Amino acid sequence: MRHYEVVFLVHPDQSEQVPAMIERYRGLIEENGGAIHRLEDWGRRQLAYLINKVHKAHYILMNIECDQETLKELENLFYYNDAVLRDMFIKRNEAVTEPSVMASQKEDKRRGDK
């Protein structure tokens, strides 16, 4: 199985459905023998440019391990889901488990660090 980094942007009006979407994608990956090594919900953030007349989106990052068929199925789910504004799949050489820069910045703000 291969490792992938997946980032997808959800329409801000659908933010309350994000946990259910994550569980559906998690179920698909795990039922086909894959694993999620890192899952981060970056929350609602400003976009650099308008996408479908929307200036904010809900960002989700997942590092997954799955086979090619599962990846294609996941790509199709994103493609046909109107709530997903953009998605990006990057092939990785190994599993990434440490927190991303975005998550560590969010944690620093919570603690009051600069």
Swiss-Prot record:
<dbReference type="Pfam" id="PF01250">
    <property type="entry name" value="Ribosomal_S6"/>
</dbReference>
<keyword id="KW-0694">RNA-binding</keyword>
<dbReference type="InterPro" id="IPR000529">
    <property type="entry name" value="Ribosomal_bS6"/>
</dbReference>
<dbReference type="GO" id="GO:0070181">
    <property type="term" value="F:small ribosomal subunit rRNA binding"/>
</dbReference>
<dbReference type="InterPro" id="IPR020815">
    <property type="entry name" value="Ribosomal_bS6_CS"/>
</dbReference>
<comment type="function">
    <text>Binds together with bS18 to 16S ribosomal RNA.</text>
</comment>
<dbReference type="InterPro" id="IPR035980">
    <property type="entry name" value="Ribosomal_bS6_sf"/>
</dbReference>
<protein>
    <recommendedName>
        <fullName>Small ribosomal subunit protein bS6</fullName>
    </recommendedName>
</protein>
<dbReference type="InterPro" id="IPR014717">
    <property type="entry name" value="Transl_elong_EF1B/ribsomal_bS6"/>
</dbReference>
<dbReference type="GO" id="GO:0022627">
    <property type="term" value="C:cytosolic small ribosomal subunit"/>
</dbReference>
<keyword id="KW-0699">rRNA-binding</keyword>
<dbReference type="GO" id="GO:0006412">
    <property type="term" value="P:translation"/>
</dbReference>
<keyword id="KW-0687">Ribonucleoprotein</keyword>
<comment type="similarity">
    <text>Belongs to the bacterial ribosomal protein bS6 family.</text>
</comment>
<keyword id="KW-0689">Ribosomal protein</keyword>
<dbReference type="InterPro" id="IPR020814">
    <property type="entry name" value="Ribosomal_S6_plastid/chlpt"/>
</dbReference>
<dbReference type="GO" id="GO:0003735">
    <property type="term" value="F:structural constituent of ribosome"/>
</dbReference>
